[in-house]
A protein has these predicted regions:
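N-terminal hydrophobic targeting/anchoring segments and the immediately downstream early-domain regions
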Residues: 1-181
Length: 181
């Protein structure tokens, strides 16, 4: 595995401009809501990207990415849909035409990384999301920005076996299964 030496962006930043001052009662209520609410973001790109955006393609060429577990937890989310797609930029500048192999590589790298982190778990349904919350873990719900299956419908089964339960049919362009326009 070739890990990237490219400096990555910070996962958590303190944005003072959006801080809301709460009194003690409001703070208690807010904390209670955070603890009791199951909060899911179904369209996230939780890959930690380079500090310098011009290094993104170089970063994508590595075979190990950092994932935003810390940011997801800090944001109070129970689970996030991962909207995998970025590795596809290695071979095209039009996201509607990413290669299936690139998409599957990114999903595989993410799932492999999840297995190495005790505080994160792959989730595929509501029961697993609730279990992750009860265990104090962050759930990563593998999704794809679009299917990128071309005319090979059996690839839907491949993605299903990789844990994909939610996918955009197209990105922008027409394909065999939908029209993004």
């Amino acid at each position: 595995m070739v890990e990237s030496s490219i400096p990555l962006a910070k996962q958590v930043i303190q944005a003072r401009s959006i801080a809301v001052t709460l009194d003690d009662d409001q703070e208690r209520r807010f904390q209670h809501l955070l603890e009791e609410t199951t909060m899911i973001d179904l369209h996230q790109h939780p890959m930690v990207k380079p500090e310098d955006p011009s290094q993104l393609l170089e970063y994508l060429r590595s075979d190990s990415y950092a994932w935003g577990y810390e940011a997801v937890r800090h944001g109070g989310f129970t689970a996030v849909g991962t909207a995998n797609v970025y590795r596809g930029m290695l071979n095209t500048d039009e996201m509607s035409f990413i290669r299936f192999a690139d998409l599957l590589d990114e999903i595989s790298m993410m799932l492999s990384d999840i297995e190495r982190h005790d505080e994160v778990v792959k989730v595929s349904d509501a029961e697993q999301i609730e279990a992750a919350k009860q265990q104090g873990k962050v759930g990563f719900f593998p999704t794809v920005e679009h299917l990128a299956i071309g005319n090979e419908l059996q690839r839907v089964d491949v993605l299903y076996n990789a844990g994909i339960r939610l996918a955009g049919l197209t990105y922008r362009r027409r394909s065999y299964i939908g029209d993004g326009q």
